[in-house]
């Protein structure tokens, strides 16, 4: 059985990006519901003893939707962090040199990467996610937009960064202003986490996805 992961930060520390109320609903209710639903759906089935990634890759329907949403939310919550009290609005965050070089090689510049990321995430129709992934087939970084519960790990693409563009992720604080939410999201990206995900993607490929998920949800 799976458990709701704990968040690695104070949910009151995000200023006008995300309120504690948003975390209370997003993590405490939405995310928790996916965990609860998944446990109820897999009880007494062949999925009961499987790890999260294996369930995602071998299921469909309700089991897939809830398992994928557990993973998607786990990853999203690790992709953000509070800004330190330096007054820079997140602009002084240092980026790992290898990650920066890879982004500049693929997207031309960090400025262009940001512009394309926000444009792509703004353009996701309806509910979904916008990802930066490492494609294990061509060894390139690329953007992927997914709808509803869909996740790029089913296509052997390793997530490095994701933003949740379901309205429940931002409506309390930003109403229908998705672009404003995305600007704030970008300022709160946990680049250390993204760099580590990239490092392990290069070393282990899709194995890094299972390692990440199993650390949060060890098979019992």
Curated annotation (Swiss-Prot):
- Cofactor binding note from Swiss-Prot or TrEMBL: Binds 1 Fe cation per subunit.
Keyword field contains Metal-binding: yes
Binding sites annotated in the UniProt record for Fe cation: 26, 73, 164, 168
Q: Which SUPFAM superfamilies match?
A: Fe,Mn superoxide dismutase (SOD), C-terminal domain, Fe,Mn superoxide dismutase (SOD), N-terminal domain
Q: What InterPro entries does UniProt report for this protein, alphabetically?
A: Mn/Fe_SOD (IPR001189), Mn/Fe_SOD_BS (IPR019833), Mn/Fe_SOD_C (IPR019832), Mn/Fe_SOD_N (IPR019831), Mn/Fe_SOD_N_sf (IPR036324), SOD_C_sf (IPR036314)
Q: Which reaction does it catalyse?
A: 2 superoxide + 2 H(+) = H2O2 + O2
Q: Which cofactor does it need?
A: Fe cation
A Pfam family per the record? Sod_Fe_N
Q: Which UniProt keywords apply?
A: Iron, Metal-binding, Oxidoreductase
Mind telling me which Gene3D superfamilies this protein's record contains?
A: Fe,Mn superoxide dismutase (SOD) domain, Iron/manganese superoxide dismutase, C-terminal domain
Which GO terms label this protein's molecular function in UniProt? metal ion binding; superoxide dismutase activity
Subunit field text: Homodimer.
What this chain does, per the record?
A: Destroys superoxide anion radicals which are normally produced within the cells and which are toxic to biological systems.
Q: Which family does it belong to?
A: Belongs to the iron/manganese superoxide dismutase family.
The name of this protein is: Superoxide dismutase [Fe]
Report the source organism.
Answer: Campylobacter coli
């Amino acid at each position: 059985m799976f458990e709701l992961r704990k968040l690695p930060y104070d949910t009151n520390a995000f200023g006008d990006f995300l309120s504690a109320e948003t975390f209370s609903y997003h993590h405490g209710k939405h995310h928790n519901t996916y965990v609860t639903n998944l446990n109820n759906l897999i009880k007494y089935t062949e999925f009961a003893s499987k790890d999260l990634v294996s369930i995602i890759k071998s299921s469909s329907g309700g089991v897939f939707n809830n398992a994928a949403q557990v993973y998607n939310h786990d990853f999203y919550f690790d992709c953000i962090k509070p800004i330190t009290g330096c007054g820079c609005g997140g602009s002084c965050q240092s980026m790992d040199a290898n990650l920066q070089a890879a982004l500049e090689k693929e997207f031309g510049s960090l400025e262009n990467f940001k512009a394309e990321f926000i444009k792509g995430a703004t353009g996701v129709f309806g509910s979904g996610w916008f990802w930066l992934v490492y494609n294990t087939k061509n060894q390139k970084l690329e953007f992927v937009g997914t709808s509803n519960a869909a996740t790029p790990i089913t296509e052997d693409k390793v997530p490095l960064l994701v933003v949740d563009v379901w309205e429940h992720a931002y409506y309390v604080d930003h109403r229908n202003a998705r672009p404003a939410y995305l600007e704030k999201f970008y300022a709160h990206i946990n680049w250390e986490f993204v760099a580590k995900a990239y490092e392990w993607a290069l070393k282990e490929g899709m194995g890094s996805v299972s390692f990440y998920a199993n650390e949060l949800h060890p098979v019992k």
